[in-house]
Amino acid sequence: MDYKALGLKTGLEIHIQLNTQRKLFCHCPPVLRDDEPHFRVERRLHISVSELGAVDPAVVWEVRKRRKYIYEGYRDTTCLVELDEEPPHLPDEEALVTAVAVAKMFNAKLFDEIYVMRKTVVDGSNVSGFQRTMLIAYGGRAKILGYDIGVETIALEEDAARKISEEGKAMVYRLDRLGIPLIEIATEPMAYTPQEVEEVAWIIGYSVKITGRAKRGVGTVRQDVNVSIAGGAKTEIKGVPDLSLIPKVIEYEAVRQVNLLKIAEELKRRGVGRVELSVADVTAAFANTKSRLVRKVLDSGGRVLALKTPGFQKLLGFEIQPGRRFGSELADYVRAWTELGGLLHSDELPGYGITAEEVREVANRLGVESFILLMGVEESELLEAAQVVVERLNMAPKGVPEETRAANPDGTTRFLRPRPGAARMYPETDLPPVKITFEIMKRAEEVAKINLDAKFKELISLGLSKDLALQLIKSPHLEKFEEYLDKFRSVPPQLIASILLNISKALAREGVEIDGAKIESVLDALNRRVITKEAVEEILRNMRPGESAEEVARRLGLVRLPYEEVKKIVEEVSRQTAKEKIIGEVMRRYRGRVDIEDVKRALAEIAS
């Protein structure tokens, strides 16, 4: 796919939990719990108008769902701030220091005073209905590992409550995650390829993690991706679970927008105007149906409504993403608005046990070939679903609607809600502006020195190749590498990195289990000059539970020979072998027992 020709633009929003002693706006510990909660409270969302009289469209959307929100908490780690029954405390200073440091890493412009804002959140994940957020800096740019990264904004905000389950119209959240400090880094739109965007996302995330001030583990980093193409629209894709999925998500969203534009062109060519809400009860057409799907609804007292979709024949079944059709988009809207599980459309019928005769009967009753079937018990819900479908159909001639979507595990996306408007942000009235003091700036400058480029250069200076240094930075082993570097000072840094990255991986492919204790034992033996680097792989391969590297070396006859003995061997071999073949011959005869550096040293001494 020619992304440049498509005019592909991609933006990232990287959210990273910070490792602090308290939550951002209260003094509760930032720990997640799996034990039985001590209490539950119930809330519902209500629309409130902003000071300018505006209402956010995403709020209207969510309130229409009539959902109930249940929040679980603990008496010893949940407070009234999280329940929105007490004003917020002043923000955590450690989180502020980290946010300012990250702003400095990306050369962003800092504000002298930080204002706490309320950002409307409509999915129930914040008890108050809003998320407290602070804009720390804007307009940053940094060149890191060869990538020119423009940063629009850096914000410090509270994380949302953790979704536990969904019970019909009730959503259950746990308050343990609510309020954990979160840094949000939003990039400028980029013209990079999807694979390059993945690299940029990793660079941003790791730039924060490398400071040691970010949480680690599953769920501590979340990526949102904004995608648009020429003629399309900005689509925000929430919750891409893994960096490796980013290229696929971007590719599939570009494909989706291309295909939605094709549908718009075809509708214009056909002269399709506005679709009106026109439904008919076609339950009688399925009185003797053999379709299990339909029969299940009818047996529970339900009915089948058919919605006319004139001019959409062959377009409802038009594939817009791998395995997803335009009809899938309509079904997403139905699922988002109502409790219905989806819909059936004429382009996929006959099918699902519905016969050609039943399809003809429905088409004859409606007087159109293109239609959608909605099945359920509640008439009001069926009519609401029909209205939602009509609204989406009437967006189709315009091309790509602006939406917030969720990433699926295969890289495709599904509709969540309309994109929020400008009315979603307003000032926090319970907190004064926060001043960035000289002390905060001074501490942030020290943290900012620990950056990705500096770490890369440091590894190169230790003798690692560029590839090995980059591989180490990208791996989860960097902290261990630095720990071992300090602990085993006689072991060459490149050998430590090679053991952690290459040798361990090669042995794992053979089915050999390698853990930290085995690696430490090998490094200790290397540090004490008991074994050679040539013997490392064989020793790790043959190490038994509870056995030390030295014990394995003695059992296998791989104990390192003393230098004086190596020198005698080199003298003996040099009398029988051509000069250029001496090193190879010694290493062949005494493989794993002699160190190549000892052989080179002995050869140099003999020659002199």
Curated annotation (Swiss-Prot):
Its EC number is 6.3.5.-. The keyword 4Fe-4S does not apply. GO terms for molecular function: aminoacyl-tRNA ligase activity; ATP binding; glutaminyl-tRNA synthase (glutamine-hydrolyzing) activity. One of its GO terms (cellular component) is cytoplasm. PROSITE patterns: GATB. It catalyses: L-glutamyl-tRNA(Gln) + L-glutamine + ATP + H2O = L-glutaminyl-tRNA(Gln) + L-glutamate + ADP + phosphate + H(+). GO terms for biological process: glutaminyl-tRNAGln biosynthesis via transamidation; translation. Keywords: ATP-binding, Ligase, Nucleotide-binding, Protein biosynthesis. Gene3D superfamilies: GAD-like domain (3.30.1360.30), GatB domain, N-terminal subdomain (1.10.150.380). The keyword Nucleotide-binding applies. Heterodimer of GatD and GatE. PANTHER family: GLUTAMYL-TRNA GLN AMIDOTRANSFERASE SUBUNIT B MITOCHONDRIAL AND PROKARYOTIC PET112-RELATED, GLUTAMYL-TRNA(GLN) AMIDOTRANSFERASE SUBUNIT E. This is Glutamyl-tRNA(Gln) amidotransferase subunit E. It comes from Pyrobaculum aerophilum (strain ATCC 51768 / DSM 7523 / JCM 9630 / CIP 104966 / NBRC 100827 / IM2).
